[in-house]
Regions:
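Core catalytic alpha/beta fold that binds nucleotide/phospho-ligands
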Residues: 1-167
Length: 167
């Protein structure tokens, strides 16, 4: 388990290794939230399916072997984690724009995660993946619908790629 803070302690990021399966994901969420908050909050979901807890902005992501959570009382947040595999390379036409010519797996994974993070951050807009433009070199995404630029943080390991952002 790892818990870190960002933006002058206004954001908390948690990462936990878990077993496979839906039950392990839910148990992992509860363990991680307890470690982050000192209690297990009630998680509700809004009409878009986005998780909500009282007093915090929250985003949750799962991938094989991991659960990641980001919390903030002050900022809207988004997070995504993806295990390293060539799965995203097979579907680049679904999420990469013609002006995002990422050919290496690392860049493709970062672009995928950054777009998923951005989608969560702007959940009320229901953005299509083609309505976001990623600059992997600058850790930057543009929401093309509302012309808003955001910076994202990325972490790349041999097991996973993690991105998160706030606004």
């Amino acid at each position: 388990m790892r818990i870190t803070r960002d933006v002058f302690d206004k954001i908390t990021i948690g990462l936990l290794t878990i077993d496979k399966g839906r039950k392990a994901e839910k148990e992992g969420e509860q363990r991680l939230l307890f470690a982050m908050l000192g209690y297990v909050p009630v998680i509700n979901h809004n009409e878009d399916g986005k998780p909500t807890i009282e007093g915090y902005h929250i985003s949750i992501s799962h991938t094989i072997g991991y659960v990641a959570i980001i919390l903030s009382m002050d900022f809207e947040v988004g997070i995504d984690i993806e295990y390293v595999s060539n799965r995203v390379s097979r579907i680049t036409s679904r999420y990469l724009r013609s002006d995002e010519p990422f050919t290496d797996l690392r860049s493709q994974l970062i672009a995928w995660c950054a777009k998923e993070t951005t989608y969560k951050l702007f959940s009320e807009e229901h953005l299509a993946l083609q309505e976001m433009k990623v600059n992997v070199a600058l850790n930057h995404v543009t929401n093309l619908r509302s012309n808003i630029d955001i910076k994202f943080v990325s972490e790349v390991t041999h097991d996973y790629v993690l991105t998160y952002a706030w606004k």
